[in-house]
Amino acid sequence: MSNDPTHQFQIHKIVPIEIGGIDFSFTNASLFMVATVACAAGFLYFATSNRGLIPGRAQSVAEMSYEFVASMLREGAGSHGMKFFPMVFSLFMFVLTANLLGMMPYFFTITSQIVVTFALAIFVIGTVLVYGFYKHGLGFLNLFVPSGVPGALLLLVVPIEVISFLSRPISLSIRLFANMLAGHITLKVFAGFVASLGSLGALGVGGALLPLAMTVALTGLEFLVAFLQAYVFAVLTCMYLNDAIHPGGH
């Protein structure tokens, strides 16, 4: 149903593909993931292909994005964290572009799918684990032993630290997924009020003014949320990478 606020999140198969009983179909979510990568890469290529001493608007945005993420990574993970800049910058641009594309009419918001955000979160935590053990060996386990804690309390503190670490991909993915899902549902509900009241004639148009104003305000807020959620995802990624670089630093 067109008035169903959750209809916009439904997955539809575009190219059905099944191999060995496993569904590998190319869906609308797959299409917009490809579109997200293409848009982000295309913008950065366009913005930097004709660089000048006096940057244009596109080049300025690209350079600001670069410096923004680089500064975030230095503050969150130190100078040694810059080796992860390509990863963090790619994640930031992917999430931001996906969020912004999802604001366009009839576009699909891939970050409103928990499987997408959870996959991104697992990638981040997996990188932390692989690098942590590669760089520090079993010394990485010092991450779960906070400095200054009396030995008698370690039996209580260590399990709490382990559970806290294991919950990171869950909290990281749900935070992004829930914010995008809730925001788009709210927008759809208010837009539905506007359409329904507007169809009732002059009286309905008058009654639709408040929902219309709310829709405009919420749209502006959602653009802000689109950036903030990409920022939060990148900041938390930097913090988690810092644990891999300095496992005994907390």
From Swiss-Prot:
GO molecular function, one term: proton-transporting ATP synthase activity, rotational mechanism
Keywords recorded for this protein, A-Z: ATP synthesis, Cell inner membrane, Cell membrane, CF(0), Hydrogen ion transport, Ion transport, Membrane, Transmembrane, Transmembrane helix, Transport
Domain of life the protein comes from: Bacteria
Pfam families listed in its UniProt record: ATP-synt_A
Transmembrane segments: 29-49, 84-104, 114-134, 143-163, 189-209, 216-236
GO annotations of cellular component type: plasma membrane; proton-transporting ATP synthase complex
Coiled coil (residue ranges): none
The keyword Lyase is assigned to this record: no
Keyword Membrane on entry: yes
Membrane topology: Multi-pass membrane protein
Intracellular or extracellular location(s): Cell inner membrane
SUPFAM superfamilies: F1F0 ATP synthase subunit A (SSF81336)
Subunit organization: F-type ATPases have 2 components, CF(1) - the catalytic core - and CF(0) - the membrane proton channel. CF(1) has five subunits: alpha(3), beta(3), gamma(1), delta(1), epsilon(1). CF(0) has three main subunits: a(1), b(2) and c(9-12). The alpha and beta chains form an alternating ring which encloses part of the gamma chain. CF(1) is attached to CF(0) by a central stalk formed by the gamma and epsilon chains, while a peripheral stalk is formed by the delta and b chains.
Function: Key component of the proton channel; it plays a direct role in the translocation of protons across the membrane.
Stated family: Belongs to the ATPase A chain family.
Protein name in UniProt: ATP synthase subunit a
Species of the source: Allorhizobium ampelinum (strain ATCC BAA-846 / DSM 112012 / S4) (Agrobacterium vitis (strain S4))
Gene that produces this protein: atpB
